Amino acid sequence: MIYLSLGSNLGDRAENLRVARELLAEALQAEPVCSAVLETEAIGFDGPAFLNQVISFESDIAPEALLDRCQEIEEKLGRPHHAAMYDPTTGRRLYSNRTIDIDIMIYNDLEYHTDRLTLPHPQVQSRPFVRTLLDNIKQRNNL
């Protein structure tokens, strides 16, 4: 099972999540199971609250190809992709507002690391809302 987290804090957040789910289902030829939607404060920067959701599906798409599809959908929904920005003083990654954010959280039981992608996602354990939504969707999947 593959688990993606979706988040939006700009525009019509619920609609952004809906369109992202629809585009992912179309791109992956798979109907996702969806968690509840949870509103959370922005983490790592001052900004509007996020709506977050986790979706799961089965697919044989390769991890890097899945990342490409996710980034294409983010761009289509108005999120530009460029190199991550870092604070020159602290070296910490700078976060920002976004119409949509799609992260691959878990890809089956795969442990994977390249310059572009780490699986499971490094923040899968450190963000309580992600754990909550993962637990919610696993219950819906009867896992």
Could you say what each language-model-derived stretch is?
Residues G11-D12, S35, A42-F50, I61-L143:
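Flexible, gly/pro- and Lys/Arg-enriched active-site loops
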Residues E58:
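Extracellular and analogous surface-interaction loops
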Residues I55:
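Short basic (Lys/Arg) and small-residue
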Residues M1-L28, P32-G44:
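N-terminal beta1-alpha1 ligand-phosphate binding loop
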